[in-house]
UniProtKB/Swiss-Prot annotation:
Domain free text: The KASH domain is involved in the binding to SUN1 and SUN2 through recognition of their SUN domains.
Name of the featured protein: Nesprin-3
GO annotation, cellular component aspect: cytoplasm; meiotic nuclear membrane microtubule tethering complex; membrane; nuclear envelope; nuclear membrane; nuclear outer membrane; rough endoplasmic reticulum
GO MF annotation: an example: actin filament binding
Pfam families for the chain: KASH, Spectrin
Gene: SYNE3
Membrane protein topology class: Single-pass type IV membrane protein
The family this protein is said to belong to: Belongs to the nesprin family.
Length: 975
């Protein structure tokens, strides 16, 4: 009876299982998201159809359930568990199938939707890309003016901002593409597609950025040009107002003030011309980036400004000529009065400036540098006042000349007298302040000596007291006192050593005699200190040896070893180069302190030797410690010597640099004052004062070369930062010197113009000018009837007066030539292993060649003074050395072009191919023309006395002296 329900149940179960297996097989076939979009859509439709079969499967499962209910109702109890188990499996299989259908379809549908959204976003991005490319493709349109260019720039910046904003969308698209590629693996979203999208975006961004940069440059150029135009128009407006204020008959200003105003305006014209030329140069670039109408407007604006400037210049020239005519029509008396008043006013300003800058009461100086600064300031003021002495004499002479005229000059004479009295009082005050500063410096420098005297008394007393100390407590009492006295001795030694290094400063302040006496006193005190210091060290060693008797070797050796290691570390730390003079002085002080500590350590080591007690191990340790200590002492002595030499060189350099700077400043102020008060009326007095100032130039020029050489030595012994500072100081000094020489040349040209004006006025004499005008005299008058004996007397006076100048110039030139020659020798000795070395050597040779005109100028000054005194052997020696140096420098330049990297350069290089025959032929070719030339010169020298009887034989004998010099010369010939 149960067989039919059982068969129906089995049939329904098999049918349901077969259907579910078929569905799962179809799902497994379509369960894949890889591949192109069409395949994905096909799988999506298949899974959707499979999902639509779910009711059919549910019907089959329900049928199984009904069959199971019927079977369970009629089957025996022992079969029910099996039926229920099969029923449970069918339900579980059905749930799994339904879940698989849903998940498979949902996954494929989600990927398809994701892909669709990505395609929409990508299409939107490419629409934006095409739109942006169309916008950025056309060339930049030329605009009319600055405002339009700024608008165009703003629009380009907006486009660039839009491009920057699209970066977020692009990053999102790239992320989605990478995610899709991981799921579908389609080539449309692979890495190449992503890179293409990124490259296209970068191209658009670069194009937008390039457009913005170009428009920014165009706008910036136009802004700079417009700012220059506005500034020039303001200047032009101000000049027009000034010129209008000086024009017309109704102008209330005095003629001199109007003429001065016009001269000031004339000084501004070159600046205006330069500004206009600069604007015209800038306009070329602006016009290229401007529309034709805007370019026409710019060109018209420039032409209008040019016309206004030319019209203004013509108006100024016409008015200045008219005012000069009026000014020349005034009387000579009024001209002299005004000149005297102007010079008096200038003199008052100079006195006021000197009183304010150099004679104001300064704060109480606390340090040595402040005291030296005060003394230098007072000395510079005193020198400046002394240099104004010729001006005082000139004021008195001009006042005497004006007194003969029948006019009331009492106010003017009172002003002159009051100014001269003020000048005298300032001289007295400056001398008093300078002497007071020198006294303070003397007391400051004497203070270490006084402290040393007190220390000597204390040290002698300690030596007397510690002569015999029987008990141990006394040793512990006096040993720290001796150590303190030794520390004070080291401090005093540092102070006295620094004082000895300031020899140039002491000589400059106190003079040679007092400075020498002070340095001798310091040296004697140093010797006394050294004796007492050594005595204290011996006494300390003795006391320590007494204390050491109560210790063992290990307790005494370990502190000595630690102290030696500490000294070695500190000495190693002091081997670096310092930046400036205070750093070098501090380093020297530290090294001297280390020396004192080394002496103390040596005394302690000697005190510890009795503890060895013939122990070989202890003896070996002690010997090793002594060896290390001696090596440290030698290294420390070398360091101290080098540091002391470096400090001394730096002190000398700083002192001479400061002196030369002060001289340049004072001389520049004097020359500026002469240029400001210069006029053709007092040309002779101005010329005399100018020659007096210029006479110091050769000596200072030689001093400049020495300072530069000392500066290079200081740079070699300084740190890179310090060398840069010294190099900057030398550069500033050279610029100041060049500015001073330019000022000298301008004044020289001005005085020449005065002589030309006087020559035009004086038609009774015929002046002869040459291009080679010496600085000591500007006019050569062949018709001057000076008797021969008077001329000889003048020459003798000039010879006596210039003897000291000649000797000083001779020494300066010799020192300068020695420094330059040593530099050349070092350059020749260089080994050019690389092309960089060759370029370095070439640059150094070019620097030496650039200073040859400077040496030639110094040598010409020597020759100018030499013939008046007769040619000396020293001058002939210097002449030969100078000729030899120039020849060696020239040959070094030629050999530089023939040498290759890695070979010895200069005169070290030999030429093996040069044979004896070639050398002989070259010597003959050179010697024969020289012999003919020498014979011709001898003939001319013999004929000179026949042509001019009153000619001195000095010049004729110069050539014979050169033969004498060559006979005495034993060195190699010049190359």
């Amino acid at each position: 009876m149960t067989q039919q329900p059982q068969d129906d149940f089995d049939r329904s179960v098999e049918d349901a299982q077969a259907w579910m297996k078929a569905v799962q097989d179809q799902l497994q076939v379509n369960d894949n998201t890889q591949g192109p979009r069409a395949a994905l859509e096909a799988r999506l439709w298949e899974t959707e159809k499979i999902c639509q079969l779910e009711p059919e499967g549910r019907v089959r499962v329900d049928l199984v359930l009904r069959m199971a209910e019927a079977l369970l109702a009629c089957c025996p109890g022992d079969q029910k568990p099996g039926i229920l188990a099969r029923l449970k499996d069918i339900k579980a299989q059905w749930e799994e199938t339904v879940t698989y259908m849903t998940h498979c379809h949902s996954r494929i549908e989600w990927v398809w939707l994701h892909w669709s959204e990505y395609l929409l976003a990508r299409d939107e991005f490419y629409r934006w890309f095409q739109k942006m490319m169309v916008t950025l493709e056309p060339h930049i349109e030329l605009q009319l003016g600055l405002k339009e260019k700024q608008w165009q720039l703003s629009h380009a910046q907006v486009l660039l901002h839009n491009v920057d904003n699209q970066a977020v969308l692009l990053d999102r698209l790239l992320e989605e593409a990478a995610s899709l590629f991981n799921r579908i693996g389609d080539p449309s979203v692979d890495e190449d597609a992503q890179k293409r999208m990124k490259a296209e975006y970068d191209a658009v961004k670069a194009k937008a950025q390039k457009r913005v940069d170009l428009l920014e440059q165009v706008a910036r150029e136009h802004e700079e040009y417009q700012a220059g135009v506005d500034e020039f128009q303001l200047w032009l407006k101000a000049v027009v107002e000034k010129v209008n204020g000086c024009l017309g008959r109704n102008c209330k200003l005095p003629i001199t003030q109007r003429l001065s105003t016009l001269q000031d305006i004339a000084k501004d014209f070159p600046r205006g011309e330069e500004s206009l030329e600069t604007l015209e140069e800038q306009s070329a670039g602006v016009i290229r980036n401007t529309s034709p109408l805007g370019a026409e407007k710019i060109t018209g604006e420039l032409e209008e400004m040019r016309k206004v400037l030319e019209k203004l210049r013509a108006l100024w020239e016409e008015e200045e000529e008219r005012l000069r005519g009026l000014l020349r029509s005034r009387g000579a008396w009024e001209q002299q009065i005004k000149q005297l008043e102007a010079e008096l006013s200038e003199f008052r300003m100079v006195l006021q400036r000197l009183a304010q800058e150099g004679l104001q009461p300064a704060a109480k100086a606390g340090t040595e540098d402040e005291l030296v600064a005060h003394w230098r300031r007072y000395s510079a003021t005193r020198a400046a006042l002394a240099s104004e002495e010729p001006r005082v004499d000139r004021l008195q002479a001009q006042l005497k000349e004006l007194i003969v005229f029948p006019h009331n000059l009492k106010p003017l004479s009172d002003s002159v007298i009051a100014t001269i009295q003020e000048y005298q009082s300032l001289k007295v005050k400056s001398a008093r302040l300078r002497n007071a500063a020198a006294v303070e410096l003397w007391q400051h420098f004497q203070r270490p000596l006084q402290d040393l005297q007190l220390w000597k008394a204390l040290a002698q007393r300690l030596l007397e007291v510690t002569a015999s100390l029987p008990d141990l407590p006394s040793l512990h009492t006096f040993l720290p006192q001796i150590e303190a006295a030794l520390m004070e001795s080291s401090r005093l030694k540092e102070l006295l050593t620094m004082l000895q290094l300031k020899k140039d400063l002491l000589i400059g302040i106190f003079g040679q005699e007092r400075a020498t006496a002070l340095l001798e006193q310091v040296a004697g005190s140093m010797r006394d200190r050294d004796l007492l210091h050594n005595s204290l060290l011996q006494r300390k060693s003795k006391l320590q040896s007494l204390l050491a008797q109560h210790k063992d070797f290990g307790a005494a050796f370990e502190p000595l070893q630690r102290k030696l290691l500490d000294l070695q570390v500190r000495v190693q730390a002091e081997k670096g180069l310092q930046r400036d003079l205070p750093g070098k002085q501090a380093q020297l002080s530290r090294l001297q302190g280390l020396q004192e500590e080394g002496l103390d350590l040596g005394a302690q080591m000697e005190a510890a030797r009795p503890l060895v007690q013939e122990n070989p191990n202890h003896q070996h340790k002690m010997d090793q410690l002594s060896s290390d200590f001696q090596a440290l002492q030698r290294s420390l002595e070398d360091l101290v010597d080098r540091c002391r030499q470096s400090v001394q060189e730096h002190c000398t350099f700083s002192h001479q640099l400061l002196e030369l700077r002060q001289w340049i400043v004072v001389t520049t102020q004097k020359l500026e004052a002469h240029r400001g008060e210069a006029g053709p009326g007092d040309a002779e007095s101005q010329e005399a004062e100018f020659e007096r100032l210029v006479a110091e130039f050769p000596e200072k020029e030689a001093q400049l070369s020495l300072v530069e050489a000392q500066g290079w030595l200081v740079m070699e012994k300084s740190s890179p930062e310090g060398a840069a500072v010294v190099q900057e100081e030398l550069r500033e000094l050279a610029e100041s010197w060049r500015a001073l020489r330019l000022l000298e040349e301008s004044l020289l040209s001005l005085i020449r113009n005065w002589h030309l004006q006087r020559m035009e006025v004086d038609s009774g004499k015929k002046m002869v000018f040459t291009n080679n005008i010496p600085k000591s005299g500007f006019l050569i008058n062949p018709m001057d009837p000076i008797p021969r004996h008077r001329r000889r007397a003048n020459l003798l006076q000039e010879e006596e007066g210039s003897h000291e100048d000649f000797s000083q110039l001779l020494r300066n030139f010799g020192q300068w030539l020695q420094v330059e020659n040593s530099k050349l020798v070092r350059i020749i000795a260089m080994r050019t292993s690389t092309a960089e070395d060759l370029r370095t050597r070439k640059s150094k040779l070019q620097e030496l060649e650039a200073r040859v005109p400077e040496g030639q100028h110094l040598f010409e000054n020597l020759l100018r003074l030499g013939p008046a005194r007769g040619t000396s052997d020293e001058l002939e020696d210097l002449r030969y050395q100078w000729m030899l140096y120039k020849s060696k420098l020239k040959d070094s330049g030629h050999l530089l072009t023939q040498s290759s990297p890695g070979e010895p350069t200069g005169f070290q290089k030999t030429r093996r191919w040069r044979g004896l025959g070639s050398l002989f032929r070259r010597a003959c070719c050179v010697a024969l023309p020289l012999q003919l030339l020498l014979l011709l010169f001898l003939l001319l020298l013999f004929l000179l006395p026949i042509r001019e009887e009153d000619r001195s034989c000095t010049l004729a004998n110069n050539f014979a002296r050169s033969f004498t010099l060559m006979l005495r010369y034993n060195g190699p010939p010049p190359t």
